[in-house]
A protein has these predicted regions:
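Hydrophobic transmembrane alpha-helices and their immediate junctions
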Residues: 273, 421-464
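Transmembrane signal-anchor hairpin modules in multi-pass inner-membrane enzymes, especially those
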Residues: 1-103, 115-138, 176-177, 182-186, ...
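Transmembrane alpha-helices of multi-pass inner-membrane enzymes
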Residues: 60-66, 267-268, 310-311, 326, ...
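Hydrophobic alpha-helical transmembrane segments
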Residues: 91-95, 128-157, 209-237, 296
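Hydrophobic alpha-helical segments of polytopic membrane proteins
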Residues: 115-117, 122, 266-345
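Long extracytoplasmic/lumenal interhelical loops at the membrane interface
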Residues: 233, 243, 354-368, 380-419, ...
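A membrane-periplasm/extracellular boundary helix in multi-pass inner-membrane enzymes
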Residues: 139, 146-157, 300-301, 318-360, ...
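A conserved mid-to-late transmembrane alpha helix and its immediate loop/hinge
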Residues: 246-257, 371, 377-380, 401-438, ...
Length: 510
């Protein structure tokens, strides 16, 4: 990331002012502050790969910061505290009254990630630290994107293209499109490995076939008769090919949170790209490659909402910054929309608003049942995730028609059902206050150096895209996405504080 004249700018959230640097307490404070920042660095590295370990680092940072507060560290003014505390308090009450207490407690634990915004805002103390965190996040995401690209170029196994319903393998449980990854422990991820595995197991009577199926990918190991398998291979028309994931999901359990993570990092990258476009050619090309890679990986998830949100976020960023090319930005948005439509039609045989596909029908059925459940418990809801346990008792139409047991596919509807209307109101208050904060301070950010301006711009675009996607996805339930939302909120608050403090010092010096 390019260097700026303000890269060393520090805010007041460093080691406590007035301390003698030679005292033990001051040295301990510096070590603890360094440990907190190290946790932030770990979170940035882990966010695109493993949210559980990132959550552990968040808890470590929270504990260390609490010790620093008890030792006298100053608590800086923090926006959004009131709606955030009310939201968590109401969610806690809903959990206490839940129809499924165990499920609700687990979900509430993830809701506490909201505190990451506070810990980050209170402890990120310089623009240089922001740069380091962003650099680590972009590098780690690039690794994830490269892995996804490798899966599509190299493949993840050998696909059994067609298995007829009257074949023995079909009755044994194998299906067309299954991607075989190993046979009796021999890997089959490339055509060469496939041939070697068949050669090594040609005398085996029973074959333990490890294969991947469905989206998100599920891994199974089933035993089949070796002669049946070899007979199927010898029949004309039964072919195999390099197997690729139906939908990209990275290291995550599902393609939806992976798409949500890519959306946020992609818009952060785009904000930096727009901000540094005219100044640093080397950084520009690096950011272009990162953004295109993220966009391609997001396209591979075939997730309509997040693809549309990326287009909207990019258009919003261009609208804010490039007033002379607003018309061109709109035309580019329309062109991208057309390309995305063609891609979705090809990959999923549906358009953007395919109301007849199973996923859209499931979502619509859940939405239709939501008002009835909200009316029964309008104040504190049914309890977080309680529909997973009590959905059949509540006569949810989607549960009757489909085997899937899932949520209401909208953050706003989910919060109203699970936690009640007051909690939903607190959430809307929090999000509205955040957007107002970003909009108000963007006028100041326009005059910052390119790196902090680009970070702030990308976070602003990501917040807009997040709100949009929350309408039709339960984004609050995807910790992989919320980790970045709260981290970015904290960084935005820290940037405003740091650079405002720097501007005041410059004014006094003048």
């Amino acid at each position: 990331m390019p260097a700026d004249s303000m890269q060393g700018t520090r805010g007041p959230a460093t080691a406590d002012p007035g301390n003698n640097p030679n005292t033990l307490s001051h040295r301990v404070a510096i070590v603890l502050d360094g440990a907190i920042f190290a946790c932030f660095c770990g979170i940035a590295v882990l966010a695109p790969h493993n949210v559980h370990w990132a959550f552990v680092l968040f808890l470590v940072a929270l504990c260390i910061w609490t010790l620093r507060l008890l030792a006298g560290k100053k608590f800086e003014p923090q926006p959004f505290m009131l709606p955030a505390l009310i939201f968590l308090a109401l969610a806690t009450i809903a959990t206490a009254l839940s129809y499924a207490p165990a499920l609700s407690r687990d979900r509430l634990g993830w809701f506490t990630l909201l505190a990451l915004a506070v810990v980050t805002a209170q402890n990120v103390s310089s623009v240089k630290q922001v740069k380091i965190l962003v650099l680590l996040l972009l590098a780690s995401t690039t690794v994830s994107v490269a892995r996804t690209g490798w899966q599509y170029v190299h493949g993840i196994g050998t696909e059994l293209v067609t298995i007829a319903p009257d074949s023995t393998l079909y009755h044994r449980g194998l299906r067309s499109g299954d991607i075989v990854q190993a046979i009796n422990g021999h890997p089959t991820r490339t055509p060469q490995q496939w041939s070697a595995a068949l050669q090594a197991t040609q005398a085996d009577k029973t074959l333990a076939v490890r294969f991947a199926r469905d989206a998100p990918l599920q891994i199974y190991t089933w035993e089949v008769d070796g002669n049946d398998f070899r007979q199927w291979l010898s029949q004309p028309g039964n072919i195999v090919q390099r197997g690729r994931p139906p939908r990209a999901q990275g290291h995550f359990y599902h393609y939806i949170p992976y798409a949500g993570m890519l959306l946020q990092v992609g818009l952060l990258t785009f904000g930096l790209l727009v901000s540094t476009w005219k100044q640093w050619s080397a950084a520009r090309w690096v950011l272009i490659m990162i953004f295109l890679g993220i966009a391609a990986a997001l396209l591979a998830t075939v997730t309509r909402t997040y693809m549309a949100a990326l287009l909207l976020g990019c258009a919003f960023i261009l609208w804010l910054t490039q007033k002379r090319i607003r018309t061109a930005a709109i035309l580019a948005l329309l062109l991208s929309f057309i390309v995305g439509t063609v891609w979705i039609e090809h990959q999923r045989q549906m358009g953007w608003l395919a109301l007849t596909d199973a996923g859209s029908e499931y979502r619509w059925l859940m939405w239709k049942d939501a008002p009835r459940l909200i009316a029964q418990h309008p104040m504190f809801g049914m309890g977080l995730d309680s529909e997973f346990l009590r959905g059949e008792q509540w006569n949810l139409a989607a549960y009757k028609k489909f085997p899937l047991r899932s949520h209401f596919h909208s953050t706003f509807i989910e919060l109203a059902v699970d936690c009640g209307l007051p909690c939903l109101a607190a959430w809307i208050w929090l999000m509205a206050a955040y957007l107002i904060f970003l909009g108000r301070h963007w006028k100041q950010a326009e005059h910052w150096d390119s790196a902090p301006r680009g970070v702030f711009l990308g976070i602003f675009g990501g917040a807009i895209a997040f709100i949009m996607s929350s309408l039709v996805h339960y984004t609050q339930g995807d910790a992989e996405v919320m980790l970045l939302i709260w981290l970015f909120m904290g960084i935005a608050i820290a940037l405003v504080r740091i650079l405002a403090s720097s501007a005041k010092r410059l004014e006094k010096a003048a």
